[in-house]
UniProtKB/Swiss-Prot annotation:
The gene is rpmJ. One of its GO terms (biological process) is translation. Keywords: Ribonucleoprotein, Ribosomal protein. GO terms for cellular component: ribonucleoprotein complex; ribosome. It comes from the Bacteria. The keyword Cytoplasm does not apply. GO terms for molecular function: structural constituent of ribosome. This is Large ribosomal subunit protein bL36. PANTHER family: 50S RIBOSOMAL PROTEIN L36 2, LARGE RIBOSOMAL SUBUNIT PROTEIN BL36B. Belongs to the bacterial ribosomal protein bL36 family. HAMAP family: Ribosomal_bL36 (MF_00251). InterPro entries: Ribosomal_bL36, Ribosomal_bL36_sp, Ribosomal_L36_bact. The keyword ATP-binding does not apply.
């Protein structure tokens, strides 16, 4: 999982990427290609 300040570029890496909020943190998840996971921080 990558940790980045800004998730905009990570969201645009794949068309299936979704931005979700869990426990006060912002994540990018991808159900089809799981290597595109990221967390904001």
């Amino acid at each position: 999982m990558k940790v980045k300040n800004s998730l905009r570029s990570l969201k645009n890496r794949h068309r299936d990427c979704r931005v979700v909020r869990r426990k006060g943190r912002v994540y990018v998840i991808n159900k089809t290609q799981r290597k595109f996971k990221a967390r904001q921080g």
